[in-house]
């Protein structure tokens, strides 16, 4: 909360020297007070920073109609740029005042209790959470609800889900042959040096099978980044897919991917088993 200092006039019993003294004190501490105000600013109701139409957190740009009604950039095209409150045009005039307020609001990272000390702009918590080193990752094994830091996830997976004497590791830049059952949907492998968990997923659709590769880890620039290549050969036909990036996720999605996948058409499928070669390349050092 921001406080205000009130100076009394000489007629109220305070001499001019006292006033000058107070002014000097205020002047000398102005910068410190401004910093303190920034640190201690508190909103009683953060809902005023949400779009009144979709109730999602505002992000820049924010638009307003001629009557001052606000709308987020996602809602404007959905409303055909017509304000639902007064039917005035909306989506052309920015609300700079609200954008300035939004830029000034910082809130603790959702992982503050786990150790993250960063403050993030309001509305960007989810973006930060995806790359926060303190974010918990979900175990990729089917029907397992375990979550932990990415560092501890490998230990859990090895102890709980890995079969004895099963070879589940691979080395970057060395092609790996994998054999997976389409109906099982997922195959887990671990990178030899970092112990990062990689998931090979397949999704059967009416026109073929989608295959994609993900890494279970935050998308932090501090962690290793990878690219990958997939190849599938049958009866002299080869399907090849190369991706410049292995997508890093906190939790696997079991929805058919819309990008970064290899599609094997039905005409090249032979039963329920896929035999593929996968090559993962490290792009930076952790």
UniProtKB/Swiss-Prot annotation:
Region (SBD): 101-285
Pfam families for this protein: Sina_RING (PF21362), Sina_ZnF (PF21361)
Binding positions for Zn(2+) 2 per the UniProt entry: 139, 144, 156, 161
Annotated zinc fingers (SIAH-type), start-end: 104-162
Record EC number: 2.3.2.27
Record field: catalytic activity: S-ubiquitinyl-[E2 ubiquitin-conjugating enzyme]-L-cysteine + [acceptor protein]-L-lysine = [E2 ubiquitin-conjugating enzyme]-L-cysteine + N(6)-ubiquitinyl-[acceptor protein]-L-lysine
Residue spans, zinc finger RING-type: 51-87
Keyword Zinc-finger: yes
Binding site for Zn(2+) 1: 109, 116, 128, 132
Presence of keyword Membrane: no
A GO biological process held by the record: protein ubiquitination
Key words, A-Z: Metal-binding, Transferase, Ubl conjugation pathway, Zinc, Zinc-finger
Bilayer-spanning residue ranges: none
InterPro entries assigned: Sina-like_RING (IPR049548), SINL_plant (IPR044286), Znf_RING (IPR001841), Znf_RING/FYVE/PHD (IPR013083), Znf_SIAH (IPR013010)
Pathway in which this enzyme or protein is active: Protein modification; protein ubiquitination
A GO molecular function held by the record: ubiquitin protein ligase activity
UniProt record similarity statement: Belongs to the SINA (Seven in absentia) family.
Entry remark concerning the domains of this protein: The RING-type zinc finger domain is essential for ubiquitin ligase activity. The SBD domain (substrate-binding domain) mediates the homodimerization and the interaction with substrate proteins. It is related to the TRAF family.
Described function: E3 ubiquitin-protein ligase that mediates ubiquitination and subsequent proteasomal degradation of target proteins. E3 ubiquitin ligases accept ubiquitin from an E2 ubiquitin-conjugating enzyme in the form of a thioester and then directly transfers the ubiquitin to targeted substrates. It probably triggers the ubiquitin-mediated degradation of different substrates.
Protein name: E3 ubiquitin-protein ligase SINA-like 7
């Amino acid at each position: 909360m921001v406080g205000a200092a009130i100076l009394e006039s000489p007629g109220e019993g305070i001499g001019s020297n006292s006033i000058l003294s107070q002014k000097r004190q205020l002047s000398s501490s102005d910068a410190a007070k401004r910093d303190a105000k920034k640190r201690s600013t508190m909103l009683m109701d953060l809902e005023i920073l949400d779009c009144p139409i979709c109730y999602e957190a505002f992000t820049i740009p924010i638009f307003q109609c001629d009557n001052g009604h606000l709308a987020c950039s996602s809602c404007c095209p959905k409303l055909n740029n017509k304000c639902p409150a007064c039917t005035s045009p909306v989506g052309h005039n920015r609300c700079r005042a609200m954008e300035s307020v939004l830029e000034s609001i910082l809130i603790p990272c959702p992982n503050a209790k786990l150790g993250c000390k960063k403050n993030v702009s309001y509305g960007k918590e989810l973006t930060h959470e995806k790359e926060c080193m303190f974010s918990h990752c979900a175990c990729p094994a089917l029907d397992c609800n375990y979550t932990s830091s990415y560092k501890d996830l490998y230990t859990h997976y090895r102890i709980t889900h890995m079969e004895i004497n099963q070879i589940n590791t691979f080395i970057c830049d060395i092609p790996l042959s994998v054999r997976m059952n389409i109906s099982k949907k997922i195959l887990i492998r671990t990178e030899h040096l970092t112990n990062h968990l990689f998931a090979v997923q397949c999704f059967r659709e009416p026109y073929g099978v989608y295959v994609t590769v993900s890494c279970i880890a935050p998308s932090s620039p501090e962690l290793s980044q990878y690219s990958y290549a997939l190849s599938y050969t049958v009866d002299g036909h080869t399907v090849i897919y190369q991706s410049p990036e292995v997508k890093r996720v906190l939790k696997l999605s079991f929805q058919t991917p819309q990008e970064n996948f290899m599609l094997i058409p039905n005409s090249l499928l032979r039963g329920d088993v896929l035999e593929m070669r996968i090559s993962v390349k490290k792009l930076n050092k952790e």
